[in-house]
Swiss-Prot record:
Region of interest (Disordered), residue spans: 93-126
Gene behind the chain: rpsM
Family recorded in the similarity comment: Belongs to the universal ribosomal protein uS13 family.
Self-association and partners: Part of the 30S ribosomal subunit. Forms a loose heterodimer with protein S19. Forms two bridges to the 50S subunit in the 70S ribosome.
Lineage of the organism: Bacteria, Bacillati, Actinomycetota, Actinomycetes, Micrococcales
Gene Ontology cellular component list: cytosol; small ribosomal subunit
Protein's recorded name: Small ribosomal subunit protein uS13
tRNA-binding recorded as keyword: yes
UniProt keyword list: Ribonucleoprotein, Ribosomal protein, RNA-binding, rRNA-binding, tRNA-binding
UniProt entry tagged with the keyword Oxidoreductase: no
Length: 126
């Protein structure tokens, strides 16, 4: 496995796909990086030379916020919204969806497993 900015890239994948294992690098950014460094996207990670790895690392670290820096920035943005008391911060604090999704049904990923509420009974048929 080639190690790039603290991430082990899978050896047998194409470079364009393997770069997406880095937090903050998707398919578009991976393609742009390969075009800027002049490396073929069809190349496998195991076929990379040391010079190409250095070129990729320099380009990624020099032009983009990735991995730890990006994670810290996102966490700081959320913390700031919570501290200033914005609506988004309130939703983060309560563990609810932030971007306006419905919560009457769904939203289970954010809310967690269902909690049964005592006292609710179904109306009986007469």
């Amino acid at each position: 496995m080639a190690r790039l900015v603290g991430v082990d890239l899978p050896r047998d994948k194409r470079l364009e796909v393997a770069l997406t294992y880095i937090y903050g690098v998707g398919r578009t950014r991976a393609a742009d990086t390969l075009k800027a460094t002049g490396i073929s996207p069809d190349l496998r990670v195991k076929d990379l030379g040391d010079a190409e790895i250095v070129a990729l690392r320099d380009h990624l670290e020099g032009n983009y916020k990735i991995e730890g820096d990006l994670r810290r920035e996102v966490a700081a943005d959320i913390r700031r919204k919570v501290e200033i008391g914005s609506y988004e911060g309130l939703r983060h604090r309560r563990g609810l969806p932030v971007r306006g999704q419905r919560t009457k049904t769904n939203a289970r990923t954010r809310k967690g497993p269902k909690r049964t509420v005592a006292g609710k009974k179904k109306a009986g048929r007469k």
